[in-house]
Structure formats: C-alpha cells, structure tokens
Amino acid sequence: MNMANLPEVTVRDLARSGVHFGHKISRWNAKMAPYIYGVHQENRIHIIDLRKTLPLLQAAMKVLYNVAFQGGRILFVGTKFQALDIIASEAIRCGQYYVNYRWLGGMLTNWGTISSSIKTLVQYEKVLNAENSILTKKELGNIEKKRQKLDKALGGIREMGAVPDVLFIIDTNKEHIAVKEAEKLEIPVVAILDTNSDPDGITYPIPGNDDSRKSIELYCRLAADSILAGMESSLARSGVKVGDIKDEEFIQEKGDSIIRTKKGRSKVYKEDEKEVVTNEDESR
C-alpha cells in the first residue's frame, strides 16, 4: 500500500496553528504529563511537546488512510461551538459522516433505535415534499419542526448505514459519552487530547490544543486529506485513473452504496476557547 500521497505536516505547521497551547496548569490531567513540554511562565498554561504530537498525529493519519482505503466508515465528532462548521464541512468534503450538534446517548450502542429515527426523518421529508398534500398548513408546520430537530441531530449520519469503523473526535471531555460507547463496542478512537484530557481508552491519541479554531481546522483538514488519499489509492488499485474523474469527484463503494464527493459535497446512491483567543485566555 503506497502512502506517498498522505498529507505532509511539520512541527512548524503545528506551532503556527497554536497546537502547543494547553490549559491553565490548575486544570491539567496528570495522565497527560508525558506529552507536556513545560509551563508558560507569564500565562501559567501548559505547553504541549510538539515533538511528541507530530509522530502520534502522523500515526493517526495513517489509520484514517487505511480505513478509507478499505472502504470503511469514519465518523467525525465535535459538538463544541468552535468546531461545529469545521467538523461538518471537512467530513462532507471527504464523503464521511459527522455529529456536530449533540451526541445522543445510544448513537453507537443503540444503533437500531437511531436507524428508526433516521427512517422517521426520511418519512417526514417525503410528506413535506409530496404534491397535493391533504395536510393543513399547521400540520405541515408541525412536521417541519420535527424534521428540523431530527435533521440537526442525525443529518450527518443519515447515510452511514451502520456503526462506523473509527471515530475522529475533537475534545474527549465534551464527547465522553461517544468515547464510552466506542470503547464498549471496541471501535477505535482517534482523538485530540488537550492538557485537561484523559488519555485512557483512546486508541490513537493526538496531544494538542482542542479549543482554537485554527488548531481544529488543521486537525480536520489533515484527517479529511488522509481519508481522501486512502480513497484515491483504493481507486488507483482498482484501475480507475483519478485524473479521469471529473470536477475533483471521488467515487468509493461502501457496502451496497456508492459515495460521491464533489467540491465539498457528498451524496449516496443506493444500488439495489483558546483561540477563542490564543490559549492565553484567562478563562483557561
């Protein structure tokens, strides 16, 4: 398997994105000590050792590449406000799935119920799109409200079809339920761990700032690029010339579905605060 097309990243890139800024020393988790370089004396925040971060990040990128190469499902998870739009846009860009509103208990461990809710969402859409509906304007309005609520929670996983093969998580403290569910089902977790995080149960930890938008953008871009690289290699192995795919469109079979990603969009065709400041925020 040729990984030459994996995205490149350096310690300098990490530093420019503020990945090294941790939390106030009073908020640290002692289990993160191996990844801490020292303390910023003026602001009393921990500084993450980017020499430790880089190889762990590269290892995680290879994992995402391999899962994509094999046609697996990857779920991006990040519900903090700094990450909402980034998580969605990068997951869509690489034809994968995301949760960016709220993690519903049982999203993994009770997939049957979640699937039923997704079917309800689809049914609502059919009713709302039906011509010559016999429903009143008020009834349609109530259905639209229910549709919006379900779409907000489940829109990013509506085409996933089954539990994912790996999770990519921003902020394991906020997404602790997702971590626990993945651990219970033995689903590998790639996660960004800040200095206040618990590394226990994280299969592929990446020590780094999980509050700065600039840092989050870097992680998610690298994750999406690694996934696209894996898909590209898979296509090349099957004899498809990537240069022949129009408009930067990638096609990848997933079970009984074909995922198409085109200019930041994905469709499924069935076949049958740190920067919040700069980490020097006093609230940290």
Curated annotation (Swiss-Prot):
One of its GO terms (molecular function) is structural constituent of ribosome. The keyword Ribosomal protein applies. GO terms for biological process: translation. Keywords: Ribonucleoprotein, Ribosomal protein. GO terms for cellular component: cytosolic small ribosomal subunit. Pfam families: Ribosomal_S2. PANTHER family: 30S RIBOSOMAL PROTEIN S2 PROKARYOTIC AND ORGANELLAR (PTHR12534), SMALL RIBOSOMAL SUBUNIT PROTEIN US2M (PTHR12534:SF0). Belongs to the universal ribosomal protein uS2 family. This is Small ribosomal subunit protein uS2. It comes from Wolbachia sp. subsp. Brugia malayi (strain TRS).
